Each structure stands twice: as C-alpha cells, then as structure tokens.
Regions:
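Glycine-rich beta-alpha junction loops
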Residues: 53-54, 153, 235-237, 284-286, ...
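Flexible, glycine/charged-enriched surface loops at secondary-structure junctions
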Residues: 90-95, 271-274, 285-294, 326
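A conserved regulatory-domain signal marking ACT and ACT-like small-molecule sensing domains
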Residues: 297-336
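Nucleotide/pyrophosphate-binding catalytic subdomain
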Residues: 6-272, 276
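Acidic-aromatic/histidine active-site loop/patch
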Residues: 279
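Broad gene-expression machinery/nucleic-acid interaction feature
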Residues: 15, 283, 321-323
Length: 336
C-alpha cells in the first residue's frame, strides 16, 4: 500500500480505534460489557471494529456443508442472534433481513452442490455484518448514538483474491472521506464497523485472511491518523512469556513494531504481522488491552522505544521443533 500525498491536513482532532474479537462479543453479557467499555471511551471519539459473534463463522461454514448436501438450514446462526437480541432487549429487523439473504445464498449453494471461494467469502461475511448491527442497536438502546457500517460503506475495498484479499491503495483516501465528519465532531454517531471483510471493484464481498479484523482496525487508525489503535483481548497486554506456562508472567509496557512482529511470528498472541503494515507507515501506536481489566494500561506497540530499552522484552516458544546440527570436517570454512 502506498501512502497518498496531500491528506495530512485532514487530521486536526484526535480519535481512537477500538477492535474487539469474536470472544469479546460472544453472548449478550459480553456485548453489554463491551458496550460499557465503548461508553467509557466515548469522549475519545472511538471507531469500533468488530468480529463475528463467538462461533458464528463455524456455524456458517457448517451450514454451507449442509447446503452442499441439499439441506438449507440457518437455524444455528438464527438461534444465536435471535436469543442474544432478546436478552439485549433490541429489535433485530436488520438481522432478520440478513438471515433471509443468507438463506437465499445457501439455497444457491444447494443447487450448485459446491462452495466457491467467492461464495465462501460472501457466506462468512454474514457473521461480522450481524455483529455490528447487534452492537449498534444495543448502544442506541442505552442512549449512546451509534451507527453500523459494513466495511465497504466507509470505502474499504480490496482486490479479488478471495479468502486472502489485499486492500487497495485508494482505501487511504476513502476512509477519511467517510469518517472525517465524525472525527471533527460534525457527526456524533459512533461508527461500528465490520472487521475482516471488504468488497472488490466488482462489488463482490471478500475476506482479508488471517488477522483480517486487526488489519481493518489498523487501516482505519492509520488512514485517520488516530491517537492509537486499541485491540482488546483477555490478557493484560503482551506478556513476558506464556502465562499458561509461567504463572509469574507479566505484561510488557512497550514493544516496537519490529519486536511485536518477531513475537507474533514465533507464536505469541500479538497482532498478525500483516496487520501492522498500515500503522508502521505512519507511526500510529497500537495498544493491546484487557477487556476484563480496563484500568490496566496494557502494552503499547510503537515505532521506537520511548524509554530505557530492556535487554530482553519477552520470550516465546515454538513447540514440536527439531534441531539438527550437522558437523563435518568438509564444512570447515564454509558458510552456515
């Protein structure tokens, strides 16, 4: 992605981007909790990026498998969202419309007896699309102005590499065009945006592959020159090591983009390296926060360390690796 020239002057006010994964919005109780977090940051003018609820993606793929066998069934997906909406006390007209659309797609799959990559991306998108509608409706019911957006509504476009699409360069200009009014205070409805999905230039829905929801969040944050991008998880940031293995593991206050990338490559639960690309271009900080410990500062990922650099920031491990050390006199003086 190439950073366009001439867009720097659009950013006179600060804002943040808040990304919540599927486990954070898995049920009504968690949705209420996330809503309370959003409300706590309301004065920061947050843009919220959401994944699909809990196991919705798995339910959608199971529905596709059934459709190939001529069984059209949206029951699992419908039950989860209808029951959750009932517990939240919200109307779900927009979700019902999506369920009708989903049933039509599954009917088409049942006729073709196959799921193409394009159809799979279209299918999977229903999870994120229902999730943002649910959250926006609940926030509104609590007196918090909010509006849901499918990613393409704010100009998030991609190529046509289904299941692993790449964002187009025009996204850098598209996002500010749609969100500047909110950032500058002319619009007060909190944008609730689908993560993970986009549309290509033909209007086909695509998915962004691994780390796709994080990529959506960092792309919005970078394009809008946000104060920071927050990704909310169930730990107090990036830990010194795996807390499941070492009970005394502690959160690391600060790491660089490069350190975060290395940790992610070797298995640490950090942002996918691909999702760091937009923020690295403009230096937008990314903060990993704990949704169950809001007061914890978490870990901030920055371009350069702002204080004393620790000799070792964190340790991660990769299991089931075999090291083979070959020693031979014939290798004397050879590289490697």
């Amino acid at each position: 992605m190439i950073l366009p020239s001439g867009i720097v002057n659009h950013y006179n006010h600060l804002m943040i981007v808040m990304k919540f994964g599927g486990s954070s919005v898995a049920n009504a109780e968690r949705i209420k909790h996330v809503a309370s977090i959003i409300q706590a940051y309301q004065d920061k003018r947050p843009v919220v990026v959401l994944s699909a609820m809990g196991d919705t993606t798995d339910h959608l793929l199971e529905a596709a498998d059934k459709a190939v066998e001529s069984v059209v069934d949206v029951g699992g997906v419908a039950k989860l969202h209808e029951e959750t909406a009932g517990e939240l006390g919200i109307k779900i007209d927009t979700i019902q419309a999506l369920l009708v659309e989903l049933k039509q797609l599954l009917t088409g799959i049942s006729m073709l007896k196959e799921v193409s990559k394009r159809s799979r991306d279209y299918l999977v998108s229903f999870g994120e699309r229902m999730s943002v509608r649910m959250m926006a409706a609940y926030l509104e019911s609590q007196g918090i102005p909010a509006k849901f957006y499918d990613a393409w509504d704010i100009g998030i476009k991609s190529d046509s590499n289904f299941m692993a699409a790449e964002l187009l360069d025009e996204v850098w200009d598209n996002i500010p065009h749609h969100l500047n009014a909110y950032k500058n205070g002319q619009d007060n409805e909190i944008p609730i945006v689908t993560g993970f999905i986009a549309k290509d230039i033909k209007g086909n829905i695509t998915t962004l592959g691994r780390g796709g929801s994080d990529l959506t969040a960092t792309m919005i944050g970078a394009a809008m020159r946000a104060e920071e991008v927050q990704t909310w998880k169930d730990v107090d940031g990036i830990m010194t090591t795996d807390p499941r293995v070492v009970k005394d593991a502690k959160p690391v206050p600060e790491v660089t983009y490069e350190e975060a990338q290395e940790l992610a490559i070797f298995g640490a639960q950090v942002l996918h390296p691909r999702s760091m690309l937009p923020v690295r271009k403009v230096g937008t900080p990314v903060r990993v926060k704990n949704s169950y410990n809001i007061k914890s500062p978490g870990t901030v990922i920055v371009e350069k360390h702002t204080g004393k650099v620790p000799p070792v920031c964190a340790i991660t491990t990769v299991k089931h690796i075999t090291l083979i050390d070959i020693v031979s006199s014939r290798m004397l003086g050879a590289a490697g």
